[in-house]
Amino acid sequence: MGNVWRADRPQRGRYRQFMQCDIDILGEPTILAEIELILATTTLLGKLDFKNFTIRINDRRILKAMAAYSGFAEADYDTVFIILDKMDKIGLDGVKEELLKEGYAEDAVTKYLELFEKVTADISGVQYLKETLGAFLPEEVAENLKTIIDSVESTKSADFKMAFDPTLVRGMSYYTGPIFEISMDEYGGSVGGGGRYDEMIGKFTGQPTPACGFSIGFERIIMLLLERDFEIPGSKNKTAYIIDKKMPSDKLLKILEQAKQARAEGQIVNIAIMKKNKKFQKDQMITEGYTQFEEFYADSFEG
């Protein structure tokens, strides 16, 4: 976890400084990393009671194969993908208009967009591109993507769906393989994403290191939780033990044992020495979420 900065126009859930929660697997070249990362991240979201969200998945090599098949030069890929990334905002017609405005051949643009009209958001869509793109797409790319989708769907513990999305770009050009994003209707966009970046670490260390990562936007998740009045499990069971400062040590041990047992049962227990202004002390604890109070005096225990 750490702070991240970017030049952006602040808006709901989008800030110039934000906290990013990241999980990465280094040294694993196979799709086991992608499967594990997706399952770990979605399990976390499930425990926070998020449901019916979507993991959109694609592969940078599919993006490149679609562009090459359509007749775009490799030097044009970045520009083409930047425009494609706007698909959810400007639609197919908007993408076509911008590609033509960039001066690309109409035949190439038409052939490119026909792929998106015919592909479906499931394993059948992956198979369609595998068959259509032929030699432009290495066979293992499509097979690996299908395996990721199948494996996650078969072993997931949270309530979400996997969707193949050939328009998913993930703006970072350092991605080398599968890429994915978390889409939530209640946010209206992505609350997290990641992918494989096998070449990045080696550029800095000189040592080739396969890598894959997944991150969630901490502020976006917190914002959504607050908007639906999410309560931390056990937060209603916050109890304060307020102890007379003259409490004998033998009786203090009994209180500590009682607190230990309560904590083992899932309660949050705060042990504090009683202050002169007890009302003010309790009021302060109430602001911290404590709803139950037990007061202990020297004569609270017999014997």
Regions found by a protein language model. Give the residues of each.
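Positively charged, Gly/Ser-enriched RNA/tRNA-binding surfaces
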Residues: 1-50, 99-303
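Hydrophobic mid-domain F-helix/FG-region of cytochrome P450s
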Residues: 40-46, 61-69
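Acidic, His- and aromatic-enriched active-site or binding-groove loops in soluble protein domains
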Residues: 72-95
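Short, hinge-like loop/turn segments at secondary-structure boundaries
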Residues: 71-73, 288-289
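Short, surface-exposed recognition loops or helix-turn segments adjacent to catalytic cores
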Residues: 52-61, 80, 163-167
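Short, conserved phosphate-binding/catalytic loop or strand-edge motifs used
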Residues: 17-21, 57-65
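Short acidic alpha-helix initiation/capping motifs at coil-to-helix transition points
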Residues: 55-58, 86-92, 140
